[in-house]
Amino acid sequence: MTMIHVNPTRMELTSLKKRLVTAKRGHKLLKDKQDELVKKFLDMVKQNRALREEVEAELIGAFKSFTMARSQMSANVVEESLMIPSAKVSINVKKENIMSVNVPKLEILQEESKNLYPYGFANTSAEMDAAIRTLATMLPKMLKLAELEKACQLMADEIEKTRRRVNALEYVLIPQLENTIKYITMKLDENERSSRTRLMKIKEMVMKG
């Protein structure tokens, strides 16, 4: 039985009882937070899984188109076609607070371009066009996937941190406080009985005298 080492006085008993009330309130708040974090985390994992499957399927399609394009075009033509991009893309990173967790929000900042394709059509194939078109439309999804995967990682870390705090309260601090309160209460009761017994003996001695 683990206890907190304090003097068994009524003042300490009152202080420990207040600490116990605070600890139990904190435990409930953290447990509620943990449950809500787990709920949001599972929702994110579900979204992440569905989006990953979608992105992977589209990437496979783009890769197939690109493979077919390479089989129909010379390596030099393929390299020259993709050498100079037709548009510049930058990413703006923001933060969103979810249950005290700052998760990233990625925003595409893309310069307007009249032409999606970074090449002329004279020496390229329809398959190359299809691959470029698919990859261009996939960019927002890939950024969203990156958002979700990072958010899942951060939420998992916060769940683990919260779980450790909940367990520390539930299995360490609260039992220590309860055991110490019981011990001090018992000691105070013993002292009170001893004092009462001494007083009774003194009273008897006075009456006999």
UniProtKB/Swiss-Prot annotation:
It comes from the Bacteria. One of its GO terms (molecular function) is proton-transporting ATPase activity, rotational mechanism. The keyword Lipoprotein does not apply. One of its GO terms (biological process) is proton motive force-driven plasma membrane ATP synthesis. Keywords: ATP synthesis, Hydrogen ion transport, Ion transport, Transport. Pfam families: ATP-synt_D. NCBIfam families: PRK00373.1-2, V_ATPase_subD. Produces ATP from ADP in the presence of a proton gradient across the membrane. Belongs to the V-ATPase D subunit family. This is V-type ATP synthase subunit D. It comes from Thermoanaerobacter pseudethanolicus (strain ATCC 33223 / 39E) (Clostridium thermohydrosulfuricum).
